Curated annotation (Swiss-Prot):
Low complexity: bias regions: 801-811
Binding-site residues, ATP: 85, 103-107, 492
Family label: Belongs to the SecA family.
Stated name of the protein: Protein translocase subunit SecA
Subcellular location: Cell membrane; Cytoplasm
Cofactor note: May bind 1 zinc ion per subunit.
One GO process term, biological-process aspect: protein transport by the Sec complex
């Protein structure tokens, strides 16, 4: 490949070359547009819309539209797009990923395809990683769009539904991935179509696309309601875990991030919890509590994986070091950590709606993204999202010097060397940015610098409010900044006066991240737009990556050299070994995400069926024919179940049949049983259906057609929502237990597909039965009205219950590495009704003989 690339250029270089004729067309329009008055320039927008209405395509008007945006940007923002930014904009319009280095002006690049696609009137979503960036970009770029006659909206956490609806109705809408995803889920929980806020998903431009579509893709978005399980047992399990001794009672597998009881540990559990056999299926819930207590105490680290703030356990994002307020680990792990830390334990919640980012973003008609680092994950973008990555050349050549890694034998020696290096740079006034992988490490470096009297600012999850402010000053003379990973991403570091002469911003990485992309992001903070700069990674053999994934060969080399504590070696072999370790971890993480997607694809097909059904009901379509079709299905199912001809007395079969159907859709005394004696099953079905249809026609006369249509919609919505929520719960339990199938040499994803499909069919059958039963028994004086079947209590981007987020069957509860919570009956939130009171559904029966049978 190297030789071919040398001769023909890389794929990106060839694609960029193909854009050049269009760039020339845009540049040729420059002079003409400069002569236009502001009013004449603004008039271009309605002219473009008219041309689109007359049959021209977006591609036809692209050169002119881009040229108009460029001229307007120069007038309104004082910034004119470079040729490279025009290239980036064209790649985004084509539905691809533009890899553009830090400082190349990605925010400005997005205005080109956003304006062009905004002309269609179908909406453009620009997706950012946090509310601050969404507000900032909408405010700044909104001036440009407003000048050109397009509207801009922003979606942030605190907006109410009316404000959200208004923002989504704008031509261009900025917002975070979480907000867009949650609004989609909420729109599919509404009971009136007017409550929806989103329009159909048209075109998304995802900023920091690697962070959103890859780093965050391991964890689903979940809207939840209050569960009913007690939290007391988490405390008991925590007390038990704290008494255990490592290696004697349990073992730790750091690579898989799993903790498992030894035989001695199992014996202690049996004594403590007074059970004969800990491994028995009846103790599956006990195993679940103990597994999570072990993980909380021995795999999850405070100030690395999570923080305790104001009596609350808050997850720390492993990629950015940011606090993930409002997110919780799933599967009871969060409760186990709360027990470990002695803070208030929140109840486990019940999932009302859920989706992964992979499946949410794949629903857009066109998807594109931009980032400084995507090429290392090119395969994943192509395989999962059908997106290819095009590297856009920098406007000026990169002048940053990337030094080889320095390898130390101990962690302490490395940190001392980092502090000395910072002290040297600070003495001459060169600004330094020190990147760490955790809050813990940030504080260690900070304390070393304090001892040396070096003034510095610390940017980590604890101070994330001042993030943009701190990072924007990091390039000033004499400034030393310690940042957890990529905190502050999205804010440019501009060099202060006299810093260029000192060599620009110096980057020091204190550890290699398990993803090469994160390391490249840290490096990319220096040397923006052709500025000078340098970067060096300081590594020790005690670092997590080296300890867990590094080879013994490296340790052997370093030990032979007999290095002093603060001595380091530079070695290509070591750098290569580190890169191989990173590739290994990246490959493993890709497999995990692929497996997660395999599971969610099953749910996705089911979700589409349910949401389509809801949408049809909400749109006010006449569902009478569907109700009658459901009725016929129920009758056919009952006839084929009970009338088999196997019983000696056919009357016994008919008796069972009538008992089953009278409860659902056949009125007592309306069927003459002897008349069915000599009929085939098909004829029996037709006869019974005719009887049911007549009964329903009578019901329609009693209610009035219009009123019954609304009752049908109410009942169908309620049945769909109740059964779907219970189904989500059941599928979740299935997923947790399915990993055990790998012991039987069965692919867990295939087993999940098959069993999940059966469960879905059962749910559809249950929806039909409940809908038909309620409609055939509803009485005019207690006709039901539309109400939500469950109230949302939280919208969380749920964290996987493992820090390494393994897929089902990979050392998580339910996989070979640990027991499962097992398929327990889903928690149901039913209003408390007396068993002998009339059922609130309007059937006229006692609660215990109607809906109360399910409770």
């Amino acid at each position: 490949m190297g030789l071919l690339n040398a001769v023909f250029g890389t794929y990106s270089e060839r694609e960029v070359k193909r854009l050049k004729p269009t760039i020339q067309k845009i540049n040729d329009l420059d002079e003409e547009l400069q002569k236009l008055s502001d009013e004449e320039l603004k008039a271009k927008t309605p002219a473009f819309k008219e041309r689109l209405a007359n049959g021209e395509t977006l591609d036809d008007i692209l050169p002119e539209a881009f040229a108009v945006v460029r001229e307007a940007s120069k007038r309104v923002l004082g910034m004119k797009h470079y040729d490279e930014q025009l290239m980036g904009g064209m790649i985004l319009h084509q539905g691809r990923i533009s890899e553009m280095k830090t400082g190349e002006g990605k925010t400005l690049v997005a205005t080109l395809p956003a304006y062009l696609n905004g002309l269609s009137g179908n909406g453009v979503h620009i997706v950012t990683v946090n509310d601050y960036l969404a507000k900032r970009d909408a405010e700044q770029m909104g001036e440009l769009y407003g000048f050109l006659g397009l509207t801009t909206g922003v979606i942030v956490h605190e907006l109410n539904n009316d404000q959200r609806r208004e923002s989504y109705a704008s031509d261009i809408t900025y917002g975070t991935n979480n907000e867009f995803g949650f609004d989609y889920l909420r729109d599919n929980m509404v009971i009136y179509k007017e409550e929806r806020v989103q329009r159909p998903l048209n075109f998304a431009i995802v900023d920091e696309v690697d962070s959103i579509l890859i780093d965050e893709a391991r964890t689903p978005l979940i809207i939840s309601g209050q569960g009913e399980k007690s939290t007391e047992f988490y405390k008991v399990a925590d007390y038990f875990a704290k008494k255990l001794v490592v290696e004697k009672d349990f073992t730790r597998d750091e690579k898989a991030n799993a903790v498992m009881l030894t035989d001695e540990g199992v014996r202690k559990a049996e004594v403590t919890f007074k059970v004969a056999n800990y491994a028995d299926a009846e103790n599956i819930e006990l195993q679940h509590y103990v597994t999570q207590a072990l993980k909380a105490n021995f795999a999850m680290r405070r100030d690395k994986d999570y923080m305790v703030k104001d009596g609350e356990v808050i997850i720390v994002d492993e990629f950015t070091g940011r606090l993930m307020e409002g997110r919780r680990y799933s599967d009871g792990l969060h409760q186990a950590i709360e027990a470990k830390e002695g803070v208030k334990i929140a109840r486990e919640s019940k999932t009302l709606a859920t989706i992964t980012f992979q499946n949410y973003f794949r629903m857009y008609k066109k998807l594109s993204g931009m980032t400084g680092t995507a090429l290392t994950e090119e395969n994943e973008f192509r395989e999962i999202y059908g997106l290819d990555v095009i590297v856009i050349p920098t406007h000026r050549p990169i002048a940053r010097k990337d030094n080889p890694d320095l390898v130390f034998s101990t962690e302490l020696g490395k940190i001392k060397a980092v502090a000395s290096e910072v002290e040297k740079a600070h003495a001459k006034g060169q600004p330094v940015l020190v990147g760490t992988v955790s809050i813990e490490k940030s504080e260690l470096v900070s304390s070393m610098l304090k001892k040396k009297g070096v003034p510095h600012q610390v940017l980590n999850a604890k101070f994330h409010e001042q993030e943009a402010e701190i990072i924007s000053h990091a390039g000033e003379k004499g400034m030393v900044t310690i940042a957890t990973n990529m905190a502050g991403r999205g804010t440019d570091i501009k060099l202060g006066e006299g810093v260029v002469e000192l060599g620009g911003l110096k980057i020091i990485g204190t550890e290699r991240h398990e993803s090469r992309r994160i390391d490249n992001q840290l490096r990319g903070r220096s040397g923006r737009q052709g500025d000078p700069g340098e970067s060096t990674f300081f590594i020790s053999l005690e670092d997590d990556l080296m300890r867990i994934f590094g080879s013994e060969k490296i340790q052997g080399v370093v030990e032979k050299l007999g290095l002093q504590e603060e001595e380091a070696i530079e070695s290509k072999m070591v750098s290569k070994a580190i890169e191989n370790a990173q590739k290994k971890v990246e490959g493993n993480n890709f497999d995990i995400r692929k497996q997660l997607l395999g599971y969610d694809d099953v749910m996705n097909i089911q979700r589409e069926v349910i949401y389509k059904q809801r949408s049809e009901v909400l749109e006010g379509e006449d569902v009478k024919e569907e109700i009658l079709s459901m009725t016929k299905d129920i009758i056919a199912d009952a006839v084929n179940t009970y009338v088999t001809g196997e019983s000696e007395d056919y009357r016994e079969e008919f008796l069972h049949l009538m008992v089953a159907l009278q409860d659902i859709c056949i009125a007592p005394g309306t069927v003459n049983l002897p008349s069915l004696e000599n009929l085939s099953n098909e004829e029996i079905i037709e006869s019974l259906f005719e009887s049911a249809r007549k009964f329903y026609e009578h019901k329609e006369e009693e209610f009035g057609a219009e009123r019954l249509r609304e009752v049908e919609r109410v009942v169908l919505l309620r049945a769909v929502d109740t059964k779907w929520m219970n189904h989500i719960d059941n599928m979740d339990h299935l997923k947790q237990g399915i990993g055990l199938q790998s012991f039987k040499q069965i692919d867990p994803v295939q087993a999940y597909q098959m069993e999940g499909s059966e469960m879905f069919n059962d749910m559809i059958k249950a929806i039909k039965e409940e809908t038909v039963r309620l409609l055939f028994h509803v009485r005019i004086e207690v006709a039901p009205e539309r109400v939500r079947v469950a109230q949302e209590t939280a919208a969380i981007h749920e964290e996987s219950s493992s820090a390494a987020a393994p897929g089902p069957g990979q050392n998580q509860p339910g996989g070979p590495g640990g027991p499962s919570a097992g398929p327990v009956a889903p928690v149901r939130n039913l209003d408390k009704h007396g068993r002998n009171e009339l059922c609130p559904c309007g059937s006229g029966k006692k609660f215990k003989n109607c809906c109360g049978r399910e409770a």
